[in-house]
Amino acid sequence: MSSQIRQNYSTEVEAAVNRLVNMQLRASYTYLSLGFYFDRDDVALEGVGHFFRELAKEKREGAERLLKLQNQRGGRALFLDVQKPSQDEWGKTQDAMEAALLVEKNLNQALLDLHGLASARGDPHICDFLENHFLDEEVKLIKKMGDHLTNLRRLAGPQAGLGEYLFERLTLKHD
C-alpha cells in the first residue's frame, strides 16, 4: 500500500535510508560487542567499555531517528539482517579504536553518499536532516577517535599494558 503523505521522496533515497539504518544498527551491535569485551574480568578496562557502550546507544538512537524520518516522509522501513561484528575478541584498545574508526569512516561515507543522492533528486529536506542530525556529529566523532588513536600509539611500546591502563584511566574516565 502506498503512502498518502509521500511527496518528493524518491525510491532511491528511501532505499538508501534503509541501508543507512542497517549500518547504524550494525555499528551499534559492534560497539556493544566492544563495550562488553572491555568490561570482561580478563580485560578489565571499564572506561573503554563505557566509551563503546555509549557509542552503541548513540548509533541505535541514530537508527531510530532515521526510521522516524522514513515514516514522516511516507517511506517504508525495511528491516534488513544486521550482520554480526567482524570478531569477538578485540585485543588491545588501540586495535579496537582502529576498528571503530573504520566503522565511523564507512558510516560517514554512507551519510555523504545519501546527502549527494538526496541533493541530486532535489530533496532538500533529507539534506537538511542529515546536516542537522548526523554529519557534524560524525566528523567530531572521527576526530575524537583519531585523537585517541594518536595518544594510544604514543603510549605503545615495551610498557604498552601500562600505557593502555593510563589511557583508560586518564582519558576515558567516567562517573
UniProtKB/Swiss-Prot annotation:
Similarity comment: family membership: Belongs to the ferritin family.
A GO biological-process term: iron ion transport
Family matches, as SUPFAM superfamilies: Ferritin-like
The protein, known as: Ferritin light chain
Occurrences of domain Ferritin-like diiron (ranges): 7-156
Subunit structure: Oligomer of 24 subunits. There are two types of subunits: L (light) chain and H (heavy) chain. The major chain can be light or heavy, depending on the species and tissue type. The functional molecule forms a roughly spherical shell with a diameter of 12 nm and contains a central cavity into which the insoluble mineral iron core is deposited. Interacts with NCOA4.
Function, in words: Stores iron in a soluble, non-toxic, readily available form. Important for iron homeostasis. Iron is taken up in the ferrous form and deposited as ferric hydroxides after oxidation. Also plays a role in delivery of iron to cells. Mediates iron uptake in capsule cells of the developing kidney. Delivery to lysosomes by the cargo receptor NCOA4 for autophagic degradation and release or iron.
Binding site for Fe cation: 54, 58, 61, 64
Modified residues (N-acetylserine): 2
Keyword vocabulary terms for this entry: Acetylation, Cytoplasm, Cytoplasmic vesicle, Iron, Iron storage, Lysosome, Metal-binding
Entry keyword annotation includes Acetylation: yes
One Pfam family linked to the record: Ferritin
Compartment annotation: Cytoplasmic vesicle, Autophagosome; Cytoplasm; Autolysosome
